[in-house]
């Protein structure tokens, strides 16, 4: 085992770990990341985020790069296995107080690539 000092150890390098690494790097905090996978998983597990997350993306410097990879989400419909509507969740189409739309759709592997390249 190799002993190396760091201020923060991040276990997991998915979107949450990657955002945390980007935030901490802005404060010159030494981080080490442990991730069991060698490559980014090519299928999305998360597909939506809101204006608060976009504000965070702006603060870590990926807003403009990532905006090109998003779709403004005008709403979502949830259906059951028989295609019966369970929930119709329309989203406002106006900019929030944070300066962004309230709902975005995205492809998670694209986000992870941008977050990792930003470090």
Predicted feature locations:
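Beta1/beta-strand and adjacent pyrophosphate-binding region of the FAD-binding site
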Residues: 2-16, 32
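Residue-level preference for beta-strand/loop junctions
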Residues: 2-4, 25, 70
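Conserved functional loop/turn residues at catalytic and ligand-binding sites
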Residues: 12, 28, 61
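Short alpha-helical segment within the catalytic ATP-binding CA
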Residues: 18-19, 51
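A generic structural signal for short, well-ordered alpha-helical segments in conserved domains
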Residues: 21-22, 116
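Glycine-rich FAD pyrophosphate-binding loop
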Residues: 23-45
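Active-site-adjacent segment of FAD-dependent monooxygenases/related oxidoreductases
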Residues: 43-45, 50-118
């Amino acid at each position: 085992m190799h002993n190396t000092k760091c201020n923060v150890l991040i276990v997991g390098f998915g979107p949450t770990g990657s955002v945390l690494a980007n935030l901490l790097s802005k404060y010159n905090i030494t981080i080490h990341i442990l991730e069991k996978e060698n490559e980014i998983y090519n299928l999305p597990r998360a597909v939506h985020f809101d204006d608060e997350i976009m504000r965070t993306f702006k603060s870590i410097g990926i807003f403009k790069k990532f905006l090109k990879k998003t779709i403004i989400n005008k709403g979502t419909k949830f259906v059951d296995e028989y295609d019966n509507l369970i929930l119709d969740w329309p989203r406002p189409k106006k900019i929030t107080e944070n300066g962004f739309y309230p709902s975005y759709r995205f492809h998670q592997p694209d986000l992870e690539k941008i977050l990792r390249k930003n470090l």
